[in-house]
Every structure is written in C-alpha cells, then in structure tokens.
Amino acid sequence: MDGRFFYSPQFDGFNFGVAEAPFAQLMAVLANESDGRFVYMGSTHTSEILPGFEQENPLDLVRSKPTGPRIWIGNSSRIGTHFDESDNIACVVSGTRRFTLFPPDQVGNLYPGPVDTTVAGQPTSLVDLADPDLERFPRFAEALKHAQSAELQPGDAIYIPALWWHGVQSTGQFNVLVNYWWQDTPADAGSPMNALGAALLSIGLLPEAKRLAWRAIFDHYVFAGREAAVEHIPERARGILGKSTPELRSTMREFLIRELKGR
C-alpha cells in the first residue's frame, strides 16, 4: 500500500479497510510508532469528537458561510488527486502536507477513475502523483505543466477553489488537518454530480450530432447564465426558468423525481 489509499489492483474494491473505532484507539495506534499500519480518519465533524472546537477556533473568512470545521487525523499517507464541489480552506495543525493542484480544465489529462465507485466520494485520478507512469498515462505530462504545489507546515493554510483537482501527501507519525468547506449556493440547490449522472444516462447515449446539439442547448440555458435565456420571455411565463426561490427549487425537484421514476 505504501500509504496510498486507492483501488485494489483488480479494481474490485479498495486497498484499505474501513472500520469504526473509539477516538482513543486511533490515538493509541498513532502513538505506537512500531505499529506499522497506515491509519487515517477523514472528514469528521469536530463537533463529534472535539466539542467546543468550532467556538474556540473560528475562521473569520468563512464565519458567515454555512459550514462547520472537519478534522483529518492520520500518519503518513497519500490521497489521490480528486476534486470537491465546495470551496475549501485547509489548515495544517500537525505534521507536513504537500498539496498539488490542477485546474478543472485538466480533467482529461488526469485520467479520472469511476464516477460511482470512488475512494472518498468524488472521482479520483488513476495516476500515482508520487510515481506517475507516463507510458500508461501520457497526457499526464501536460497536466503537470499546469500543476501548482505547496508544502504546508503547522500553522499554514491553503485555499482550494471548488472543482480544482488536488492530491495530498501527508508525512509524519501524527498528522492533523482542519478544513472548512462552504458553497455559495442555497442549501437546497441540487448537486451538479447528480446532473452529471442524469446526463450520462441520457445525453451520453446519443450519437455525436445529437450530443453536440444538446451542448448548444445547455450552453444557452445553463452556462450562458439564466438572464440571457429568459430576457425575451414575460416574467409571468418563465416557469422553471424564472427567478430561483425555495418554492421553485422544490417544484423543480419534484418534477425531476417524477420524471426519473417514470423512466
């Protein structure tokens, strides 16, 4: 394993196990340097194991955002290059962490793995950042031209924009990171990953000419901005193209559920 949390060689599972254990047991394993195991507790709300932490360690930059700090604890490990849907500020508390970031447009050069079976929730690059196999993944050489890396010590923090790919290497017997995720969309907004899944089920099965036609339609209704798509439609007649409100989002969600069930 060499500290790399990843898929099994046959991609029929993972090269690590998942278990629930008391926090004290995790600390005991990390305190025993002769244990030899790679141990990792990821993305745990501080309120679950460190009550009062959030109140004593507020992050003013995101104080107004609907977020709560999460804590990551382990020893030396490598987390594959992936992206998160939320903006992120990550703060190193103990140990050293090296972050390598790639802009979203490098997705094709990063060779992402499965969408529905993932190491930690989001698609992960199949390239080993510490030892890239450029014969198997030749386009990764282009991705490296766009990479940005930073090595963080205790007290350092890094801002990772939403959808930026990032790989993380942790070193040290006791490594701790606290991060703050947030989004600038309403809490009841849908996840773009769900939209991706629906698109794979529908648009992804169409011939190329129809896929390109749908690209133009999505550009008009989604990517060009809502106002450009509706400025010629009377406001009272805009329907789901109208101004986004909690009521409208609820209606849209119910509509989508009915449509998916009907198919």
Give residue spans per PLM region.
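N-terminal accessory scaffold of Fe(II)-dependent oxygenases
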Residues: M1-A157, G167-R263
